[in-house]
Protein backbone atom coordinates (compact mmCIF):
# COMPACT_ATOMS: atom_id res chain seq x y z
CA UNK A 1 0.00 0.00 0.00
CA UNK A 2 1.32 3.45 -0.91
CA UNK A 3 1.82 5.52 2.29
CA UNK A 4 -0.28 8.60 2.88
CA UNK A 5 2.60 11.11 2.70
CA UNK A 6 2.97 10.16 -0.95
CA UNK A 7 -0.55 11.44 -1.57
CA UNK A 8 -0.24 14.31 0.87
CA UNK A 9 2.76 15.69 -0.99
CA UNK A 10 1.13 15.41 -4.37
CA UNK A 11 -2.38 16.66 -3.85
CA UNK A 12 -0.91 20.16 -3.57
CA UNK A 13 -1.15 21.12 -7.19
CA UNK A 14 -0.89 24.88 -6.77
CA UNK A 15 0.99 26.72 -9.48
CA UNK A 16 3.63 27.84 -6.96
CA UNK A 17 4.38 24.24 -6.01
CA UNK A 18 4.59 23.14 -9.62
CA UNK A 19 6.76 26.13 -10.50
CA UNK A 20 9.30 25.50 -7.72
CA UNK A 21 9.67 21.84 -8.68
CA UNK A 22 10.08 22.56 -12.37
CA UNK A 23 12.66 25.28 -11.61
CA UNK A 24 14.60 22.74 -9.58
CA UNK A 25 14.64 20.36 -12.50
CA UNK A 26 15.90 23.07 -14.85
CA UNK A 27 18.72 24.08 -12.44
CA UNK A 28 19.84 20.48 -12.05
CA UNK A 29 19.79 20.07 -15.80
CA UNK A 30 22.06 23.09 -16.28
CA UNK A 31 24.53 21.84 -13.66
CA UNK A 32 24.85 18.56 -15.49
CA UNK A 33 25.19 20.40 -18.82
CA UNK A 34 22.19 18.76 -20.37
CA UNK A 35 19.25 20.41 -22.06
CA UNK A 36 16.61 21.46 -19.53
CA UNK A 37 13.17 19.94 -19.88
CA UNK A 38 10.90 22.37 -21.75
CA UNK A 39 8.86 24.55 -19.36
CA UNK A 40 5.46 23.51 -20.68
CA UNK A 41 6.27 19.80 -20.63
CA UNK A 42 7.60 19.96 -17.07
CA UNK A 43 4.50 21.76 -15.85
CA UNK A 44 2.19 19.38 -17.69
CA UNK A 45 4.07 16.39 -16.25
CA UNK A 46 3.79 17.57 -12.65
CA UNK A 47 0.14 18.54 -13.01
CA UNK A 48 -0.70 15.21 -14.60
CA UNK A 49 1.07 13.32 -11.80
CA UNK A 50 -0.65 15.44 -9.16
CA UNK A 51 -4.10 14.95 -10.67
CA UNK A 52 -3.51 11.20 -11.00
CA UNK A 53 -2.52 10.93 -7.33
CA UNK A 54 -5.46 13.09 -6.26
CA UNK A 55 -7.92 10.92 -8.19
CA UNK A 56 -6.36 7.74 -6.82
CA UNK A 57 -6.65 9.01 -3.25
CA UNK A 58 -10.36 9.68 -3.73
CA UNK A 59 -10.88 6.29 -5.38
CA UNK A 60 -9.33 4.37 -2.49
CA UNK A 61 -12.35 4.89 -0.23
CA UNK A 62 -14.99 3.63 -2.65
CA UNK A 63 -14.71 0.03 -1.45
CA UNK A 64 -15.25 -0.89 2.19
CA UNK A 65 -12.67 -3.69 2.23
CA UNK A 66 -10.00 -1.19 1.14
CA UNK A 67 -11.14 1.26 3.81
CA UNK A 68 -10.71 -1.46 6.45
CA UNK A 69 -7.04 -1.69 5.49
CA UNK A 70 -6.58 2.08 5.05
CA UNK A 71 -7.70 3.07 8.54
CA UNK A 72 -5.26 0.56 10.05
CA UNK A 73 -2.25 2.27 8.43
CA UNK A 74 -0.12 4.71 10.40
CA UNK A 75 0.30 6.78 7.25
CA UNK A 76 -3.48 7.19 6.87
CA UNK A 77 -3.82 8.15 10.52
CA UNK A 78 -1.03 10.68 10.02
CA UNK A 79 -2.90 12.18 7.07
CA UNK A 80 -6.12 12.41 9.11
CA UNK A 81 -4.23 13.97 12.01
CA UNK A 82 -2.56 16.50 9.70
CA UNK A 83 -5.94 17.39 8.22
CA UNK A 84 -7.45 17.94 11.65
CA UNK A 85 -4.58 19.78 13.30
CA UNK A 86 -1.99 21.17 10.88
CA UNK A 87 -2.39 24.57 9.25
CA UNK A 88 -0.22 23.56 6.28
CA UNK A 89 -3.09 21.70 4.62
CA UNK A 90 -5.06 24.95 4.46
CA UNK A 91 -2.75 25.80 1.55
CA UNK A 92 -4.85 23.49 -0.61
CA UNK A 93 -7.40 25.19 -2.84
CA UNK A 94 -11.07 25.10 -1.87
CA UNK A 95 -12.07 22.21 -4.12
CA UNK A 96 -9.35 20.04 -2.59
CA UNK A 97 -10.34 21.05 0.94
CA UNK A 98 -13.81 19.71 0.24
CA UNK A 99 -12.64 16.58 -1.56
CA UNK A 100 -10.06 15.61 1.07
CA UNK A 101 -12.64 16.04 3.86
CA UNK A 102 -15.08 13.88 1.92
CA UNK A 103 -12.43 11.22 1.31
CA UNK A 104 -11.36 11.01 4.95
CA UNK A 105 -14.96 10.73 6.17
CA UNK A 106 -15.73 8.00 3.63
CA UNK A 107 -12.79 6.02 4.98
CA UNK A 108 -14.60 5.80 8.34
CA UNK A 109 -16.69 2.99 6.84
CA UNK A 110 -13.65 0.76 7.43
CA UNK A 111 -13.81 1.10 11.21
CA UNK A 112 -15.15 -1.64 13.41
CA UNK A 113 -18.56 -0.15 14.26
CA UNK A 114 -20.76 2.90 14.00
CA UNK A 115 -19.56 4.40 17.28
CA UNK A 116 -15.93 4.22 16.14
CA UNK A 117 -16.87 5.80 12.80
CA UNK A 118 -18.71 8.65 14.51
CA UNK A 119 -15.81 9.26 16.89
CA UNK A 120 -13.45 9.37 13.91
CA UNK A 121 -15.56 12.11 12.28
CA UNK A 122 -15.68 14.07 15.54
CA UNK A 123 -11.90 13.91 15.76
CA UNK A 124 -11.51 15.13 12.19
CA UNK A 125 -13.79 18.14 12.42
CA UNK A 126 -14.08 19.04 16.10
CA UNK A 127 -11.39 21.72 16.00
CA UNK A 128 -12.92 23.37 12.94
CA UNK A 129 -16.38 23.57 14.50
CA UNK A 130 -14.76 25.05 17.62
CA UNK A 131 -12.91 27.60 15.50
CA UNK A 132 -16.13 28.83 13.84
CA UNK A 133 -17.80 29.06 17.23
CA UNK A 134 -14.96 31.09 18.73
CA UNK A 135 -14.69 33.34 15.69
CA UNK A 136 -18.42 34.08 15.64
CA UNK A 137 -18.38 35.07 19.32
CA UNK A 138 -15.57 37.65 19.03
CA UNK A 139 -16.51 41.15 20.08
CA UNK A 140 -14.55 42.63 17.19
CA UNK A 141 -15.82 40.11 14.66
CA UNK A 142 -16.95 42.69 12.10
CA UNK A 143 -13.43 44.06 11.70
CA UNK A 144 -11.57 40.76 12.15
CA UNK A 145 -13.79 38.90 9.69
CA UNK A 146 -12.88 41.22 6.83
CA UNK A 147 -9.17 40.41 7.01
CA UNK A 148 -8.13 38.48 3.86
CA UNK A 149 -6.50 35.63 5.79
CA UNK A 150 -9.62 35.18 7.94
CA UNK A 151 -11.88 35.19 4.87
CA UNK A 152 -9.67 32.51 3.31
CA UNK A 153 -9.62 30.42 6.49
CA UNK A 154 -13.40 30.65 6.91
CA UNK A 155 -13.85 29.66 3.26
CA UNK A 156 -11.59 26.63 3.73
CA UNK A 157 -13.45 25.51 6.85
CA UNK A 158 -16.82 25.91 5.12
CA UNK A 159 -15.63 23.78 2.22
CA UNK A 160 -14.36 21.13 4.63
CA UNK A 161 -17.72 21.11 6.36
CA UNK A 162 -19.42 20.76 2.99
CA UNK A 163 -17.16 17.83 2.11
CA UNK A 164 -17.99 16.08 5.37
CA UNK A 165 -21.71 16.75 4.92
CA UNK A 166 -21.70 15.34 1.39
CA UNK A 167 -20.09 12.12 2.69
CA UNK A 168 -22.96 11.45 5.09
CA UNK A 169 -24.17 7.87 5.35
CA UNK A 170 -26.05 5.92 8.05
CA UNK A 171 -22.86 4.85 9.83
CA UNK A 172 -21.62 8.43 10.34
CA UNK A 173 -24.95 10.28 10.30
CA UNK A 174 -25.03 10.95 14.03
CA UNK A 175 -21.65 12.70 14.18
CA UNK A 176 -22.34 14.74 11.04
CA UNK A 177 -25.69 15.88 12.44
CA UNK A 178 -23.96 16.92 15.67
CA UNK A 179 -21.34 18.77 13.64
CA UNK A 180 -23.97 20.74 11.73
CA UNK A 181 -25.95 21.39 14.90
CA UNK A 182 -22.85 22.80 16.63
CA UNK A 183 -22.27 25.38 13.89
CA UNK A 184 -25.87 26.50 13.37
CA UNK A 185 -25.55 29.77 15.27
CA UNK A 186 -22.04 30.53 13.93
CA UNK A 187 -23.37 30.03 10.40
CA UNK A 188 -26.11 32.60 10.97
CA UNK A 189 -23.63 35.04 12.50
CA UNK A 190 -21.28 34.61 9.54
CA UNK A 191 -24.12 35.15 7.08
CA UNK A 192 -24.78 38.46 8.78
CA UNK A 193 -21.11 39.47 8.78
CA UNK A 194 -20.34 38.37 5.22
CA UNK A 195 -23.58 39.56 3.62
CA UNK A 196 -21.56 41.65 1.14
CA UNK A 197 -19.05 38.86 0.40
CA UNK A 198 -20.96 36.91 -2.24
CA UNK A 199 -18.31 34.17 -2.48
CA UNK A 200 -18.51 33.41 1.25
CA UNK A 201 -22.32 33.55 1.23
CA UNK A 202 -22.35 31.00 -1.56
CA UNK A 203 -19.98 28.62 0.28
CA UNK A 204 -22.08 28.97 3.40
CA UNK A 205 -25.30 28.15 1.55
CA UNK A 206 -23.73 25.17 -0.21
CA UNK A 207 -22.65 23.69 3.13
CA UNK A 208 -26.16 24.07 4.54
CA UNK A 209 -27.64 22.47 1.41
CA UNK A 210 -25.25 19.50 1.59
CA UNK A 211 -25.84 19.04 5.31
CA UNK A 212 -29.64 19.21 5.14
CA UNK A 213 -29.72 16.96 2.07
CA UNK A 214 -27.60 14.31 3.78
CA UNK A 215 -29.43 14.45 7.11
CA UNK A 216 -33.10 15.17 6.53
CA UNK A 217 -34.22 11.60 5.77
CA UNK A 218 -32.72 10.21 9.00
CA UNK A 219 -33.77 12.87 11.50
CA UNK A 220 -36.23 12.15 14.27
CA UNK A 221 -39.13 14.54 14.80
CA UNK A 222 -37.42 16.78 17.36
CA UNK A 223 -34.27 16.96 15.22
CA UNK A 224 -36.31 17.80 12.14
CA UNK A 225 -37.98 20.62 14.05
CA UNK A 226 -34.55 22.05 14.92
CA UNK A 227 -33.34 21.87 11.31
CA UNK A 228 -36.53 23.40 9.92
CA UNK A 229 -36.31 26.24 12.44
CA UNK A 230 -32.68 26.83 11.48
CA UNK A 231 -33.55 26.93 7.78
CA UNK A 232 -36.35 29.39 8.47
CA UNK A 233 -33.95 31.68 10.35
CA UNK A 234 -31.42 31.36 7.54
CA UNK A 235 -34.02 32.33 4.93
CA UNK A 236 -35.25 35.23 7.04
CA UNK A 237 -31.72 36.56 7.46
CA UNK A 238 -30.99 36.14 3.76
CA UNK A 239 -34.18 38.01 2.92
CA UNK A 240 -33.74 40.79 5.50
CA UNK A 241 -30.45 41.87 3.96
CA UNK A 242 -31.81 41.64 0.41
CA UNK A 243 -29.02 39.23 -0.42
CA UNK A 244 -29.55 38.00 -3.95
CA UNK A 245 -31.49 41.01 -5.20
CA UNK A 246 -30.06 42.73 -8.25
CA UNK A 247 -30.32 46.48 -8.71
CA UNK A 248 -31.78 47.51 -12.04
CA UNK A 249 -29.69 50.69 -11.84
CA UNK A 250 -26.49 48.78 -12.57
CA UNK A 251 -24.78 49.15 -15.91
CA UNK A 252 -25.36 46.35 -18.41
CA UNK A 253 -21.94 44.77 -17.78
CA UNK A 254 -22.32 44.88 -14.00
CA UNK A 255 -25.90 43.67 -14.27
CA UNK A 256 -24.76 40.66 -16.28
CA UNK A 257 -22.01 39.92 -13.76
CA UNK A 258 -24.46 40.28 -10.87
CA UNK A 259 -26.90 37.86 -12.47
CA UNK A 260 -24.17 35.30 -13.00
CA UNK A 261 -23.08 35.64 -9.37
CA UNK A 262 -26.51 35.64 -7.77
CA UNK A 263 -27.94 32.75 -9.73
CA UNK A 264 -25.61 30.48 -7.76
CA UNK A 265 -27.23 31.60 -4.51
CA UNK A 266 -30.68 31.01 -5.94
CA UNK A 267 -29.72 27.51 -7.05
CA UNK A 268 -28.53 26.76 -3.53
CA UNK A 269 -31.79 28.05 -2.02
CA UNK A 270 -33.83 26.00 -4.47
CA UNK A 271 -31.83 22.90 -3.56
CA UNK A 272 -32.34 23.62 0.13
CA UNK A 273 -36.12 23.85 -0.28
CA UNK A 274 -36.11 20.65 -2.36
CA UNK A 275 -34.18 18.81 0.36
CA UNK A 276 -36.67 19.93 3.01
CA UNK A 277 -39.57 18.79 0.83
CA UNK A 278 -38.01 15.34 0.45
CA UNK A 279 -38.70 14.62 4.15
CA UNK A 280 -42.32 13.94 3.28
CA UNK A 281 -41.26 11.56 0.50
CA UNK A 282 -38.33 9.63 2.05
CA UNK A 283 -38.26 9.32 5.84
CA UNK A 284 -36.22 6.71 7.75
CA UNK A 285 -36.97 8.11 11.21
CA UNK A 286 -38.94 6.18 13.81
CA UNK A 287 -41.58 8.85 14.46
CA UNK A 288 -43.64 11.31 12.50
CA UNK A 289 -42.70 14.97 12.24
CA UNK A 290 -46.32 15.81 13.02
CA UNK A 291 -45.72 14.63 16.60
CA UNK A 292 -43.58 17.73 17.11
CA UNK A 293 -45.96 20.00 15.25
CA UNK A 294 -43.34 20.58 12.57
CA UNK A 295 -44.79 22.02 9.39
CA UNK A 296 -42.23 21.87 6.60
CA UNK A 297 -44.73 23.48 4.25
CA UNK A 298 -44.45 26.72 6.25
CA UNK A 299 -40.72 27.11 5.65
CA UNK A 300 -41.25 26.13 2.03
CA UNK A 301 -44.01 28.75 1.76
CA UNK A 302 -41.70 31.39 3.21
CA UNK A 303 -38.87 30.26 0.96
CA UNK A 304 -41.08 30.59 -2.10
CA UNK A 305 -41.89 34.19 -1.23
CA UNK A 306 -38.16 34.90 -1.04
CA UNK A 307 -37.02 33.01 -4.11
CA UNK A 308 -39.75 33.54 -6.70
CA UNK A 309 -39.38 37.34 -7.05
CA UNK A 310 -35.65 36.88 -7.63
CA UNK A 311 -36.06 34.40 -10.48
CA UNK A 312 -36.57 36.30 -13.69
CA UNK A 313 -37.10 34.79 -17.12
CA UNK A 314 -33.57 35.93 -17.97
CA UNK A 315 -32.15 33.91 -15.07
CA UNK A 316 -34.12 30.87 -16.23
CA UNK A 317 -31.90 30.89 -19.31
CA UNK A 318 -29.20 29.38 -17.10
CA UNK A 319 -29.80 25.64 -17.68
CA UNK A 320 -28.90 24.41 -14.18
CA UNK A 321 -30.94 27.06 -12.41
CA UNK A 322 -33.85 26.42 -14.77
CA UNK A 323 -33.77 22.69 -14.06
CA UNK A 324 -33.56 23.13 -10.28
CA UNK A 325 -36.36 25.69 -10.27
CA UNK A 326 -38.85 23.57 -12.21
CA UNK A 327 -37.84 20.44 -10.30
CA UNK A 328 -38.69 22.23 -7.06
CA UNK A 329 -41.90 23.72 -8.46
CA UNK A 330 -43.22 20.38 -9.69
CA UNK A 331 -42.29 18.76 -6.38
CA UNK A 332 -43.95 21.52 -4.35
CA UNK A 333 -47.16 21.36 -6.33
CA UNK A 334 -47.28 17.58 -6.01
CA UNK A 335 -46.60 17.53 -2.25
CA UNK A 336 -47.82 20.94 -0.99
CA UNK A 337 -50.30 22.31 -3.57
CA UNK A 338 -52.18 24.15 -0.82
CA UNK A 339 -49.00 26.07 0.06
CA UNK A 340 -48.58 27.37 -3.48
CA UNK A 341 -52.28 28.24 -3.60
CA UNK A 342 -51.77 30.50 -0.55
CA UNK A 343 -49.21 32.69 -2.31
CA UNK A 344 -50.24 36.30 -2.79
CA UNK A 345 -51.49 37.28 -6.23
CA UNK A 346 -48.18 38.79 -7.32
CA UNK A 347 -46.08 35.76 -6.34
CA UNK A 348 -48.66 33.36 -7.76
CA UNK A 349 -48.75 35.23 -11.07
CA UNK A 350 -44.96 35.10 -11.19
CA UNK A 351 -45.00 31.32 -10.69
CA UNK A 352 -47.56 30.93 -13.48
CA UNK A 353 -45.50 33.14 -15.78
CA UNK A 354 -42.51 30.87 -15.31
CA UNK A 355 -44.71 27.81 -15.94
CA UNK A 356 -45.85 29.30 -19.22
CA UNK A 357 -42.21 29.95 -20.10
CA UNK A 358 -41.30 26.36 -19.24
CA UNK A 359 -44.09 24.85 -21.35
CA UNK A 360 -42.43 26.28 -24.45
CA UNK A 361 -38.88 25.41 -23.46
CA UNK A 362 -36.56 23.54 -25.80
CA UNK A 363 -35.61 21.01 -23.12
CA UNK A 364 -38.13 18.15 -23.00
CA UNK A 365 -37.33 17.50 -19.33
CA UNK A 366 -38.26 21.08 -18.41
CA UNK A 367 -41.55 20.76 -20.33
CA UNK A 368 -42.27 17.47 -18.58
CA UNK A 369 -41.78 19.06 -15.15
CA UNK A 370 -44.10 21.92 -16.12
CA UNK A 371 -46.74 19.44 -17.23
CA UNK A 372 -46.43 17.63 -13.90
CA UNK A 373 -46.89 20.98 -12.17
CA UNK A 374 -50.04 21.70 -14.17
CA UNK A 375 -51.41 18.26 -13.38
CA UNK A 376 -50.85 18.82 -9.66
CA UNK A 377 -52.38 22.30 -9.76
CA UNK A 378 -55.49 21.31 -11.71
CA UNK A 379 -56.11 18.04 -9.86
CA UNK A 380 -55.78 19.82 -6.51
CA UNK A 381 -58.38 22.41 -7.54
CA UNK A 382 -60.75 19.78 -8.94
CA UNK A 383 -60.64 17.56 -5.85
CA UNK A 384 -60.96 20.49 -3.46
CA UNK A 385 -63.93 22.03 -5.24
CA UNK A 386 -65.59 18.61 -5.58
CA UNK A 387 -65.54 18.35 -1.77
CA UNK A 388 -67.01 21.84 -1.35
CA UNK A 389 -63.76 23.71 -0.67
CA UNK A 390 -62.33 26.73 -2.48
CA UNK A 391 -59.30 25.07 -4.07
CA UNK A 392 -57.31 27.75 -5.85
CA UNK A 393 -60.02 30.27 -5.06
CA UNK A 394 -59.61 33.63 -6.75
CA UNK A 395 -56.52 32.40 -8.60
CA UNK A 396 -58.76 30.13 -10.69
CA UNK A 397 -61.49 32.69 -11.29
CA UNK A 398 -61.56 35.15 -14.15
CA UNK A 399 -61.17 38.84 -13.35
CA UNK A 400 -61.18 42.25 -14.96
CA UNK A 401 -57.88 44.05 -15.40
CA UNK A 402 -57.28 47.77 -14.85
CA UNK A 403 -58.60 48.47 -18.35
CA UNK A 404 -61.87 46.69 -17.70
CA UNK A 405 -60.99 43.71 -19.91
CA UNK A 406 -61.95 40.24 -18.69
CA UNK A 407 -58.92 38.05 -17.98
CA UNK A 408 -59.24 34.27 -17.92
CA UNK A 409 -58.56 32.28 -14.78
CA UNK A 410 -55.28 30.40 -14.67
CA UNK A 411 -56.78 26.97 -15.37
CA UNK A 412 -58.66 28.30 -18.41
CA UNK A 413 -55.48 29.92 -19.65
CA UNK A 414 -53.45 26.74 -19.38
CA UNK A 415 -56.19 24.57 -20.91
CA UNK A 416 -56.17 26.83 -23.96
CA UNK A 417 -52.36 26.91 -24.04
CA UNK A 418 -51.94 23.15 -23.69
CA UNK A 419 -54.47 22.35 -26.43
CA UNK A 420 -52.71 24.83 -28.70
CA UNK A 421 -49.40 23.09 -28.00
CA UNK A 422 -50.74 19.59 -28.59
CA UNK A 423 -52.63 20.37 -31.78
CA UNK A 424 -50.49 22.93 -33.57
CA UNK A 425 -46.94 23.09 -32.20
CA UNK A 426 -43.87 20.87 -32.37
CA UNK A 427 -42.92 18.72 -29.37
CA UNK A 428 -41.41 15.37 -28.51
CA UNK A 429 -43.83 12.41 -28.77
CA UNK A 430 -42.46 11.28 -25.40
CA UNK A 431 -44.31 14.18 -23.78
CA UNK A 432 -47.81 13.07 -24.82
CA UNK A 433 -48.28 10.94 -21.70
CA UNK A 434 -47.40 13.79 -19.33
CA UNK A 435 -49.51 16.18 -21.41
CA UNK A 436 -52.49 13.83 -21.09
CA UNK A 437 -52.07 13.72 -17.30
CA UNK A 438 -52.18 17.53 -17.18
CA UNK A 439 -54.97 17.94 -19.75
CA UNK A 440 -57.39 15.53 -18.08
CA UNK A 441 -57.90 17.51 -14.81
CA UNK A 442 -57.80 20.80 -16.73
CA UNK A 443 -60.74 19.66 -18.86
CA UNK A 444 -62.63 18.47 -15.77
CA UNK A 445 -62.10 21.88 -14.14
CA UNK A 446 -63.04 23.87 -17.25
CA UNK A 447 -65.57 21.73 -19.15
CA UNK A 448 -67.42 24.76 -20.49
CA UNK A 449 -64.26 26.21 -22.00
CA UNK A 450 -63.35 22.82 -23.49
CA UNK A 451 -66.70 22.74 -25.29
CA UNK A 452 -66.24 26.31 -26.58
CA UNK A 453 -62.73 25.62 -27.84
CA UNK A 454 -63.98 22.45 -29.53
CA UNK A 455 -66.79 24.36 -31.23
CA UNK A 456 -64.32 26.99 -32.46
CA UNK A 457 -62.22 24.26 -34.10
CA UNK A 458 -65.31 22.69 -35.65
CA UNK A 459 -66.56 26.00 -37.07
CA UNK A 460 -63.19 26.67 -38.69
CA UNK A 461 -63.30 23.32 -40.52
CA UNK A 462 -64.93 23.79 -43.96
CA UNK A 463 -64.57 20.19 -45.16
CA UNK A 464 -67.71 18.24 -44.07
CA UNK A 465 -65.85 14.93 -43.80
CA UNK A 466 -63.07 16.38 -41.69
CA UNK A 467 -65.59 18.30 -39.62
CA UNK A 468 -67.42 15.07 -38.80
CA UNK A 469 -64.15 13.37 -37.85
CA UNK A 470 -63.28 16.29 -35.59
CA UNK A 471 -66.68 16.23 -33.85
CA UNK A 472 -66.38 12.51 -33.15
CA UNK A 473 -62.76 12.82 -32.01
CA UNK A 474 -63.53 15.64 -29.55
CA UNK A 475 -66.35 13.59 -28.07
CA UNK A 476 -64.29 10.40 -27.89
CA UNK A 477 -61.47 12.22 -26.11
CA UNK A 478 -63.64 12.73 -23.02
CA UNK A 479 -65.85 9.63 -23.20
CA UNK A 480 -64.11 6.67 -24.88
CA UNK A 481 -62.76 3.65 -22.97
CA UNK A 482 -65.34 4.11 -20.19
CA UNK A 483 -63.62 7.27 -19.00
CA UNK A 484 -65.20 8.77 -15.87
CA UNK A 485 -64.66 12.02 -13.97
CA UNK A 486 -62.71 10.39 -11.13
CA UNK A 487 -59.03 11.32 -10.97
CA UNK A 488 -57.55 7.90 -10.28
CA UNK A 489 -54.85 5.81 -11.92
CA UNK A 490 -57.15 3.84 -14.21
CA UNK A 491 -58.81 6.98 -15.59
CA UNK A 492 -55.46 8.64 -16.18
CA UNK A 493 -54.44 5.56 -18.19
CA UNK A 494 -57.71 5.64 -20.15
CA UNK A 495 -57.30 9.32 -20.95
CA UNK A 496 -53.75 8.73 -22.16
CA UNK A 497 -55.10 6.23 -24.68
CA UNK A 498 -57.87 8.61 -25.68
CA UNK A 499 -55.47 11.51 -26.26
CA UNK A 500 -53.11 9.32 -28.26
CA UNK A 501 -55.96 8.26 -30.56
CA UNK A 502 -57.30 11.82 -30.73
CA UNK A 503 -53.97 13.25 -31.92
CA UNK A 504 -53.57 10.52 -34.53
CA UNK A 505 -57.05 11.27 -35.83
CA UNK A 506 -57.04 15.08 -36.04
CA UNK A 507 -53.57 16.63 -35.59
CA UNK A 508 -52.56 16.05 -39.21
CA UNK A 509 -55.42 17.85 -40.91
CA UNK A 510 -55.76 20.55 -38.22
CA UNK A 511 -52.18 21.70 -38.80
CA UNK A 512 -52.95 22.23 -42.50
CA UNK A 513 -55.97 24.48 -41.89
Give short role names for the model-derived ranges.
Residues 64, 111, 165-168, 215, ...:
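Long alpha-helical scaffolds in large eukaryotic adaptor/regulatory proteins
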Residues 240, 330, 334-338, 360, ...:
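Short amphipathic alpha-helices and their capping/turn residues within compact interaction modules
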Residues 63-68, 112-116, 170-172, 215-219, ...:
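Alpha-solenoid ARM/HEAT helical repeat scaffolds used for protein-protein interactions
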Residues 407-513:
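Extended, C-terminal alpha-helical/coiled-coil scaffolding tails that mediate protein-protein interactions
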Residues 1, 5-7, 16, 28-62, ...:
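Extended HEAT/HEAT-like alpha-solenoid repeat tracts in very large eukaryotic scaffold/adaptor proteins
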Residues 1-38, 70-91, 117-142, 173-194, ...:
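Amphipathic alpha-helical segments within extended alpha-helical solenoids and repeat-rich scaffolds
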Residues 384-390:
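Short, flexible/disordered intra-domain loops and linkers
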Residues 280-294:
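Compositionally biased, intrinsically disordered low-complexity regions enriched for acidic
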